[in-house]
């Protein structure tokens, strides 16, 4: 049996922007010939694209790191460096992408060809031609390329099925799927024969068709991870109609109605929206002794829970092995699907703001100041660190420009307020300098 991998942890890193160039042309009466250094090219972004031909996340088990290429450096004659191509990563339909650090849903990929920028490539650094001013017509300033974004991700694949079969182990879900579709699930006379979801296409006599999933058997406590647990409960989320299969012969010694209540409790505990989906009760193994009596008792207990007869779920007595009652069940399922819309998987508040690019949603702080045990002042913060890595520390003019940027951000004043004195060491990353009051 082919393995079905439905979760994966990967890292993605977008490409760095190319460095800008410091260059001068040779021209009479123009200081240093005039600036002629071009900009660096943009780094490649990492883009996820849905491929309907993929069925599992198996590929991500062997390839966990995805890194886009960096942009080329700027060139002389004011020519820009070539931008790097984006890295396209193909994922199957039904893939949910989460930020591994925050647990936030970044995107839900369900349409063939759908694309999402998962990590944005860094912009290219500006060449010295960009920094020319009347006061400084020959600047020796160029920016380094901006680093590309790097993210740790959790991928989760929920199979795309219109109808999901749920129920205790060994109630006949796999057998039902095998006789109404071309799927060939593993069938055995023991619990948890199905340890991976099986998917089959069903066509009714009237010509309707839909995808049906045989999901691994649930047991009490599945929503807390007991048994096969939440790793397979997640697949039910995408179904529009649930077929609740019950062993009406009680061959395992359990009460059919108690089975029904127990499974619904697990669905409700896992996700309240699962109980919003219409359910059809499939009373299976009706060819077995005592099944008819058990069904009568089941209907009586079920009716006691409803005030109105019309609110009762539909019940279809069948025997998968004997091929009895299947046509009526499938026709009713197709009719219910036709009038059932898709359900939202997540609250809007749970989703990262969805633009063409899915970036970090947190408000970016300009900088933070801490102090090490050796009394060194440490500057950090996304904006400040980005300015730092884009500064060419080998050129004095670039360093002076960076110092002006720090002053404009209020870093100097903040250091003074914290008690920094003339000559104190200040560190940004691995770069250290003396504070000048």
UniProtKB/Swiss-Prot annotation:
GO biological process: ribosome biogenesis
Pfam families named among the record's database cross-references: DUF1967 (PF09269), GTP1_OBG (PF01018), MMR_HSR1 (PF01926)
Ranges where the Obg domain occurs: 2-160
Residues forming coiled coils: none
SUPFAM superfamilies (alphabetical): Obg GTP-binding protein C-terminal domain, Obg GTP-binding protein N-terminal domain, P-loop containing nucleoside triphosphate hydrolases
NCBIfam families (alphabetical): Obg_CgtA, Obg_CgtA_exten, PRK12296.1, PRK12297.1, PRK12299.1, small_GTP
Listed transmembrane segments: none
Entry GO MF terms: GTP binding; GTPase activity; magnesium ion binding
Residue stretches making up the OBG-type G domain: 161-338
Main localization category: cytoplasm
HAMAP family named among the record's database cross-references: GTPase_Obg
EC number(s) stated in the UniProt entry for this protein: 3.6.5.-
Listed name of the protein: GTPase Obg
Record's GO cellular component terms: cytoplasm
Top enzyme category: hydrolase
Keywords: Cytoplasm, GTP-binding, Hydrolase, Magnesium, Metal-binding, Nucleotide-binding
Protein family (similarity comment): Belongs to the TRAFAC class OBG-HflX-like GTPase superfamily. OBG GTPase family.
Annotated ranges, domain OCT: 359-437
InterPro entries named among the record's database cross-references: G_OBG, GTP-bd, GTP-bd_Obg/CgtA, GTP-bd_prot_GTP1/OBG_C_sf, GTP1-OBG_CS, GTP1_OBG_dom, GTP1_OBG_dom_sf, OBG_GTPase
Ligand binding (GTP): 167-174, 192-196, 214-217, 284-287, 319-321
The protein's role, per its UniProt record: An essential GTPase which binds GTP, GDP and possibly (p)ppGpp with moderate affinity, with high nucleotide exchange rates and a fairly low GTP hydrolysis rate. Plays a role in control of the cell cycle, stress response, ribosome biogenesis and in those bacteria that undergo differentiation, in morphogenesis control.
Subunit field text: Monomer.
Required cofactor names: Mg(2+)
């Amino acid at each position: 049996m082919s393995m079905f991998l439905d979760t994966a942890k990967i890292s993605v890193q977008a490409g760095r922007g190319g460095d800008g160039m410091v260059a001068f042309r040779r021209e009479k009466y123009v200081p240093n010939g005039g600036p002629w250094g071009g900009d660096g090219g943009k780094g490649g972004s990492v883009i996820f694209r849905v491929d309907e031909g993929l069925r599992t996340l198996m590929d991500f088990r062997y390839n966990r790191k995805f890194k886009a290429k960096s942009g080329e450096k700027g060139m002389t004659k004011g020519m820009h460096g070539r931008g790097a191509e984006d890295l396209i990563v193909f994922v199957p339909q039904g893939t949910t992408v989460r930020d591994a650090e925050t647990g936030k849903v970044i995107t839900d990929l369900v349409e063939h060809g759908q694309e999402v920028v998962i990590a944005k490539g860094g912009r290219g650094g500006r060449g010295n031609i960009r920094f020319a001013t009347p006061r400084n017509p020959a600047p020796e300033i160029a920016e380094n390329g901006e680093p590309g974004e790097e993210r740790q991700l959790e991928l989760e694949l929920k199979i795309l099925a219109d109808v999901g079969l749920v129920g205790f182990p060994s109630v006949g879900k796999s057998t039902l799927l095998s006789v109404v579709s071309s799927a060939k699930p593993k069938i055995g006379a023991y619990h948890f024969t199905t340890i991976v979801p099986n998917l089959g296409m069903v066509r009714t006599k009237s010509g309707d068709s839909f995808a049906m999933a045989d999901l691994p058997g649930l047991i009490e406590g599945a929503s807390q991870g007991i048994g096969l647990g939440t790793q397979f409960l997640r697949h039910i989320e995408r179904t529009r109609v649930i077929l609740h299969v019950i062993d009406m012969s009680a061959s395992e010694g359990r009460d059919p109605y108690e089975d029904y209540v127990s499974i619904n409790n697990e669905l409700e505990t896992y996700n309240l929206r699962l109980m919003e989906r219409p359910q059809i009760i499939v009373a299976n193994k009706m060819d077995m002794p005592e099944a008819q009596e058990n069904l009568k008792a089941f209907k009586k207990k079920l009716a006691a829970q409803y005030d109105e007869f019309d609110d009762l779920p539909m019940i279809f007595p069948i025997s998968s092995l004997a091929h009895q009652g299947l046509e009526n069940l499938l026709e009713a399922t197709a009719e219910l699907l036709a009038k059932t819309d898709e359900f939202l998987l997540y609250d809007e508040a749970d989703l990262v703001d969805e633009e063409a690019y899915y970036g970090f949603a947190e408000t970016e702080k300009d900088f933070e100041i801490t102090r090490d045990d050796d009394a060194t002042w440490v500057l950090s913060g996304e904006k400040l660190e980005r300015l730092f890595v884009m500064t060419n520390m080998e050129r004095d003019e670039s360093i002076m420009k960076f110092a002006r940027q720090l002053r404009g951000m209020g870093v100097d004043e903040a250091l003074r307020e914290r008690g920094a004195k003339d000559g104190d060491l200040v560190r940004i990353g691995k770069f250290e300098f003396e504070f000048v009051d």
